[in-house]
């Protein structure tokens, strides 16, 4: 089958591509966006593929993105399982780039649902105003959107001050948040005010989220193998076999999956182990912290924590060295107005690492 490429900034073209993919006319690859009308150089793609609906690049937050082939059967299973869990198909508001799995799913599921998605310009930085404007254009049926935690934080802060923003969020039947561990203060606060925040866990290799609020889709099995999360089911990417052992740490508690963080984000400092994802979760609970990313800094004396955050200059991060462990004392700390992010909306860990190393 021919592989057709569409740039991410051509969202209508990408939406039409999904229709062709579902009709089994072509396979699709959504490339990074054009810059000044010039398409990015894309190397290594085949002209044709077999048993493939979409080739999707992973976010590449820690390095070079991987290209992952997904079959139409896997994508259809994921779309139907998601709709079943959410209470039915509906209209989607696109707030994420379409060349990554979460944004691509919005388009794919819109075609499956036979609904017209409302399309934000995801090539521009996310703003509450643009989101609310998009939400106001949605129909009266079931409403969904998919966000990353940083976007949800901005909406949560705005909803505290602006009744109209809050009312627009209440109109969504579900707001999915995924891509990384969420800020649980935001999730719990919005839920307490009647907004249905669904915490999604998955990755490109699983056609996106396959666990909602700790519960796997029907037909999907999630277990832990030596602490690593293992997923099996009909939505796995081509070539993975019957199960996929992720690089994420987790545990099953009362029948629900709790994601603890990435296995490659555990440092050893002074003989003490520290999960950077756990550090971030606890640091986000500190008063005055809006957004935060932690990375490992390595020297001849071992590893330590480096932190870049958005928030008050008065935040006391030293609290964490007593409440978590001595390893949680940051070696480097930078306060910024905006976290460096990839086009996927995830933190740019490589850039953040460079900033912190340059500050030492």
Ranges and model annotations:
Residues 51-80, 87:
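Conserved AMP-binding A3 loop
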Residues 221-245, 249-250, 256, 310:
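AMP-binding/adenylate-forming core of the ANL superfamily
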Residues 70-77, 91-154:
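AMP-binding/adenylate-forming
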Residues 10-24, 82-83, 101-114:
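Hydrophobic alpha-helical segments in the ANL/AMP-binding
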Residues 8-12, 40-57, 88-91:
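Conserved pre-ATP/AMP-binding loop-to-beta segment of ANL
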Residues 157-213:
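Gly/Ser/Thr-rich phosphate-binding loop
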Residues 247-328:
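AMP-binding/adenylate-forming catalytic core of the ANL superfamily
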Residues 294-295, 306-308, 320-360:
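Conserved C-terminal "lid"/linker of ANL adenylate-forming enzymes
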């Amino acid at each position: 089958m021919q592989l057709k490429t569409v740039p991410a900034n051509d969202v209508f073209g990408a939406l039409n591509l999904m229709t062709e993919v579902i009709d089994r006319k072509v396979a699709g690859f959504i490339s990074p966006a054009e810059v000044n009308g010039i398409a990015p150089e894309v190397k290594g793609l085949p002209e044709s593929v077999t048993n493939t609906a979409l080739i999707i690049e992973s976010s590449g937050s820690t390095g070079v993105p991987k290209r992952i082939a997904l079959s139409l059967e896997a994508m259809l299973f994921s779309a139907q399982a998601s709709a079943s869990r959410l209470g039915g198909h509906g209209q989607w508001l696109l707030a994420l780039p379409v060349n990554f799995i979460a944004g691509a799913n919005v388009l794919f599921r819109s075609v499956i649902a036979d609904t017209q998605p409302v399309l934000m310009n995801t090539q521009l930085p996310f703003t509450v105003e643009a989101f609310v404007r998009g939400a106001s254009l949605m129909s009266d049926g079931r409403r969904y959107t998919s966000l990353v935690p940083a976007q949800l934080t901005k909406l949560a802060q705005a909803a505290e001050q602006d009744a109209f923003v809050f009312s627009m969020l209440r109109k969504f039947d579900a707001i999915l948040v995924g891509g990384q561990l969420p800020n649980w203060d935001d999730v719990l606060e919005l839920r307490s005010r009647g907004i249905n925040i669904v915490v999604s866990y998955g990755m490109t290799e699983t056609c996106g989220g396959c666990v909602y609020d700790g519960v796997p889709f029907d037909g999907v099995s999630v277990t832990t193998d030596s602490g690593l999360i293992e997923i099996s089911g009909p939505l796995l990417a081509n070539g993975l076999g019957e199960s996929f052992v992720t690089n994420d740490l987790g545990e099953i508690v009362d029948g629900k999956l709790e994601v603890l963080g990435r296995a490659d984000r555990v440092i050893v400092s002074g003989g003490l182990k520290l999960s950077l994802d756990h550090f971030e979760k606890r640091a986000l609970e500190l008063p005055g912290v809006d957004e935060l990313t932690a990375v490992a800094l390595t020297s001849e004396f071992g590893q330590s924590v480096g932190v870049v955050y958005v928030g008050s200059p008065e935040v006391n991060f030293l609290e964490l060295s007593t409440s978590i462990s001595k390893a949680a004392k940051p070696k480097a700390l930078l306060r910024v107005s905006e976290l460096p992010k990839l086009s996927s909306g995830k933190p740019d860990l490589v850039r953040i690492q460079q900033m912190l190393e340059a500050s030492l």
